[in-house]
């Protein structure tokens, strides 16, 4: 069982995330501000938020486990991911920003539908279903990571870990929308970056 200091730290962490949602609740006064933050989130926050959401439990739990089991052959995953991320932000993101502003689109399905003059909404419906299907699977993997973290670190039952992690996300997203999501991800992304840099160094010196 984890010490009470760890429980207190995790408690403060979860409360802080929900406090961000409460703070941005008053900032989301329109549909566009709730969905896209009025397109006013800076590139640092946007980039860190996107990468924290994209990597999340996979980067800190899945990839280290894969490297431990398979060795440095897993480094190709990192190289491919880094290259793909760079190309995405270099070429896809700027063009997508310009085009979505041009069509005043709030979501990818609505942009594709407007771009291709899909008056009957077939493309919008199909693309929304595809996104919903695959993101449900990906989101589930993040909740699994949350459950495993609570179980291994705090000794809390896996199911309760999933519920606590998922419940926290639902609360701050429901309250603050896109802005709350971006800033909580930015905060967590900074923690992830710090952990990636510090933990290997500490492990190396402690392990001799």
What spans do the regions from the language model cover?
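Residue-level recognition of pore/gate-forming positions within transmembrane alpha-helices
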Residues: 14-17, 53-54, 81-85, 131-132, ...
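Membrane-interface "cap" regions at the ends of multi-pass membrane proteins
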Residues: 1-60, 173-176
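Small-residue-rich segments of transmembrane alpha-helices in multi-pass membrane proteins
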Residues: 43-49, 114-115, 188-202
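Helix-coil boundary and interhelical linker segments in multi-pass alpha-helical membrane proteins
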Residues: 1-5, 65-76, 152, 205
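Membrane-interface helix-loop-helix modules in multi-pass membrane proteins
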Residues: 35-104
């Amino acid at each position: 069982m984890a010490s009470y200091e760890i429980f207190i730290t995790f408690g403060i962490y979860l409360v802080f995330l929900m406090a961000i949602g409460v703070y941005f609740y008053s900032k989301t006064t329109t549909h566009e501000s709730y969905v896209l933050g009025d397109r006013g989130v800076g590139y640092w926050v946007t980039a860190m938020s996107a990468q924290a959401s994209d990597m999340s439990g996979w980067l800190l739990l899945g990839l280290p486990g894969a490297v431990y089991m398979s060795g440095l052959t897993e480094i190709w995953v990192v190289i491919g991911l880094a290259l793909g991320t760079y190309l995405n932000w270099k070429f896809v993101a700027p063009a997508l920003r310009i085009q979505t502003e041009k069509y005043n689109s709030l979501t990818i399905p609505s942009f594709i539908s407007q771009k291709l003059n899909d008056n009957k909404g077939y493309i919008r419906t199909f693309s929304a279903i595809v996104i919903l299907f695959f993101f449900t699977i990906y989101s589930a993997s993040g909740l699994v990571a949350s459950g495993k973290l609570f179980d291994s670190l705090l000794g809390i039952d896996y199911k309760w870990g999933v519920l606590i992690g998922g419940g926290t996300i639902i609360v701050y997203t429901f309250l603050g929308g896109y802005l709350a999501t971006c800033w909580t991800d930015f905060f967590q992304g900074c923690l992830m970056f710090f952990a990636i840099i510090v933990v290997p160094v500490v492990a190396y010196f402690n392990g001799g």
